Amino acid sequence: RADQVLDRLVASGNLTEEEVAGARTHPAEVLARGKDEGREYFVDWIAQQVEEKLPDTTGRIVVYTTLDLRRQRAGEEAVEHALAGMGKERNVSQGSLIALAPDGAVLAMVGGRSYVESQFNRATQAKRQPGSAFKPIVYLAALEAGYTPESPVTDEPVSMGGWSPRNASSRDWGTVNLTTALANSINTISVQVGNRIGIDRIVSTAERLGIEGPLPRNLSIVLGSSEVTLIELASAYTPFGNEGRRTEPYGITSIEAENGDTLYRHVPASEQVIKRE
């Protein structure tokens, strides 16, 4: 990783190959884990964006970000606590977390348990099946198709093409409304609803919320069989708490040159993807 940084410094013209030769010959000693290690995932993510926004910039710059240190510390502690508890019980060694403000500002980002052990950012790079976390998107599609929160739906066995999804518990829910079905994550009802409104509507809704896919064209999508990144899924949730408006996640508020000139400033932008009513 140190060599990659040195290569970038040479490529950008900030240093010559002769100037970095000593650093290559005598690399820095790796220090023990520090208190700020968890923030390095966010720093890496920001560094990539700086290169994309200002590819030809040379010299020193000052980057102002959205990171909230209090929330970042809380996020790191939450991930570690979860991995030490339930994670240990289920043999899960890694986890990630991202906290977004309604306007898309990234307030906290935890890409893994230890940046020293793994620089792979699981919050922005790892694609995982969201499972039941995908269901709010399905139920949004149902509401847009004419269902209401009080629409009655019945918990009954489902079998489609040899696929028979089951609920997490053996409880027979009987007939409940749509709100109760979502609140209790009832698989059988979710699949029935998805079948009635159609896969195309679900896929279209997911894409409108920012899920990039590829999304499966079968009913397993209802139970979260598609693969998404954590930042992608979190971003898809923002319209629910933002009066239906979607914003792209961002981590840089502004970039200044050493002399104070503004080189970049984030301009808030949003798109109405859900009707406010």
Each PLM stretch: what is its role?
Residues 11-30, 89-100, 154-159, 250-261:
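Acidic/histidine-enriched alpha-helical segments
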Residues 65-88, 97-99, 109, 114-120, ...:
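A penicillin-recognizing enzyme superfamily signal
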Residues 4, 9, 75, 104, ...:
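Active-site SXXK
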Residues 1-73, 77, 105, 110, ...:
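Non-catalytic, structured segments within soluble enzyme domains
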